[in-house]
A protein has these predicted regions:
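Secondary-structure "cap/kink" motif recognition
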Residues: 165-171
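Short acidic, Gly/Ser-rich segments with clustered Asp/Glu that frequently serve as metal-coordination loops
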Residues: 179-180
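PLD/PLD-like phosphodiesterase catalytic module centered on the HKD motif
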Residues: 1-154, 184, 191-318
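Short amphipathic alpha-helices and their capping/turn segments at secondary-structure boundaries
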Residues: 158-165
């Protein structure tokens, strides 16, 4: 799960971010952004943010420039006003409601709230001193590390663990040894897991590219005929698929390769990798079973090396 957070273009000029020990605060915010966050910012003010960054100590400025270049961020949908112009937390929540913000960070000397932090309905507002104890980031960390329990609601899993990852990603890459086998089994019997995921993407009106790597286990023709027919005669004929799925590709690899390279099952959302013990079978039309679960930065996983190996050894591409 991601925490969608915001600070206005004046925040980086705060007194506490210009002190001798400020590098600790800067690093903490940047690390939380990297691991669990997505910055929501007004596109019209992007240059103002960079101007403030360039005015910082060079060592700190370099860290922020990396963050703005590589970490997850998304333009603000609401009509923008600087946080410093608001009188109450409720005013902020109402103005920024369409952005579904989780957290706003404000300077320590802000009069917007009297406490170090407060939560108004679903929006947490935290002064700099409270960022270490942010409930939003703590919740994101917990959901990134907590396994899925038997009987959990699949709709809750999608909403709490995947919604903001999907909202803030351009490419989903799935590595799941048994996806093709399960999908073919489900086509005529129940709603396939893939359709559950696609319907959720459609509900978010998110345009995204999807790539799936799976094995040819129990298939004489590498599932080419049945999957080609499904993609071309079922998926591509729907309005939602045409509207929101920018590209869709299925790669079939020999099952022996998965035994060696891809035993674990992954869903990558750009540079965030979800490891799912049961793969996307968790979304099949069955009661939810116990399932190991984690989300990590792609550089802390073997995802890229496994993907490279699979990409070089495809038996069929659909």
């Amino acid at each position: 799960m991601l925490t969608e957070f915001h600070f206005d273009e004046f925040y980086l000029g705060s007194d506490e971010l210009d002190s001798e020990n400020a590098i600790f605060i800067h690093k903490k915010i940047i690390d939380l952004w990297k691991d669990f966050g997505c910055l929501v910012y007004p596109n019209i003010k992007k240059s103002d943010y960079i101007d403030w960054v360039n005015g910082l100590d060079p060592k700190i400025s370099k860290l922020w420039l990396v963050a703005f270049s590589h970490y997850k961020k998304t333009p603000m949908a609401s009509n923008y006003m600087p946080v410093s112009d608001f009188q109450t937390p409720l005013d902020i929540e109402e103005t920024y409601s369409s952005d579904e913000l989780d957290l706003i960070i404000i300077p320590n000397n802000s009069s917007l709230i009297n406490e170090i932090s407060c939560t108004t309905h679903n929006l947490e507002i935290s002064k700099t001193n409270g960022i270490i104890d942010s409930t939003s980031f703590a919740n994101s960390k917990s959901l990134c590390e907590q396994d899925i329990a038997e009987g959990d609601s699949i709709d809750d899993i999608l909403d709490k663990r995947f919604k903001k990852l999907i909202k803030n990603s351009k490419v989903i890459t799935i590595i799941d040894r048994y996806w093709a086998k399960n999908h073919v089994e489900d086509i005529s019997r129940r709603k396939p897991a893939l359709l559950k995921i696609l319907d959720f993407i459609y509900s978010l009106k998110q345009k995204i590219a999807i790539t799936i790597y799976t094995s040819n286990v129990d298939s004489a023709d590498d599932y080419k005929e049945i999957l080609s027919n499904y993609v071309n005669l079922t998926l591509k004929r729907t309005v939602n698929f045409s509207s929101f799925i920018l590209s869709f590709e299925i790669s079939i690899c020999d099952d022996s390769l998965f035994r060696e390279q891809g035993h674990d099952r992954y869903i990558a959302f750009d540079d965030k990798v979800c490891t799912l013990g049961r793969g996307i079978a968790i979304f099949r039309d069955y009661p939810v079973p116990n399932c190991t679960f984690s989300i990590k930065d792609i550089n802390h996983t073997q995802f890229n090396s496994i993907l490279t190996k699979l990409s070089k050894n495809r038996k069929a591409v659909i």
